[in-house]
Design a protein with these regions (language model features):
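Conserved GTP-binding G-domain of TRAFAC-class P-loop NTPases and closely related GTPase folds
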Residues: 1-8, 13-16, 21, 25, ...
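Short catalytic-loop micro-motif centered on adjacent basic/acidic residues
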Residues: 72-76, 101
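Flexible, glycine- and charge-enriched loops at secondary-structure boundaries
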Residues: 48-55, 77, 120, 124-127
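Aromatic/hydrophobic pocket-lining residues that form π-stacking "cages" and hydrophobic walls in ligand
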Residues: 61, 87-89
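Short, surface-exposed connector motifs at secondary-structure boundaries
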Residues: 67-73, 94-96
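Acidic, metal-coordinating catalytic cores used for nucleic-acid/nucleotide bond scission
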Residues: 75-87
């Protein structure tokens, strides 16, 4: 029984903070983060890069975690319904049997405020668009 926690939320909502807290409480879990993957592939988490390369690495890490039966956290915005469906489909295909979505529902004004304090800022119009999609 391999479990996946699918984090959902705006940039600045606290998804990565929640993931870090979960890993502290449950160190046997694995974190798969699209930001970390961007850092590995492109040298910077801020570099968007070709999505297909990021997705290939997500697939690889999902497969490894599922084969090893490691409970996993997937940290990405997952703002669009179709993106969440793709992640759930991939998770099932790679062997995850229990998939739980956790919506980190933070007020958009707070996400925008936090975003302004970050080194790696997401454009405000992008956050507002994601907010409408959620």
């Amino acid at each position: 029984m391999t479990k996946l926690l699918l984090l959902i939320g705006l940039p600045g909502s606290g998804k990565s903070t929640l993931a870090a807290q979960l890993l502290t409480e449950c160190p046997q879990m694995q974190l798969i983060s699209t930001d970390a993957i961007r850092g590995q592939l492109f040298g910077s988490q801020a570099t968007q890069g070709p999505w297909f390369l990021i997705w290939q690495e997500v697939e690889r890490q999902f497969q490894q975690a599922s084969i090893a039966n490691i409970p996993t956290i997937f940290d990405a915005t997952n703002a669009q319904r179709r993106n969440r469906r793709e992640v759930i489909e991939l998770a099932r295909h790679t062997g995850f049997t229990h998939i739980t979505g956790i919506w980190v529902r933070t007020p958009v004004w707070l996400c925008l405020t936090r975003n302004k304090k970050r080194d790696r800022q997401v454009p405000e119009d992008v956050i507002l668009r994601m907010h409408r999609q959620l």
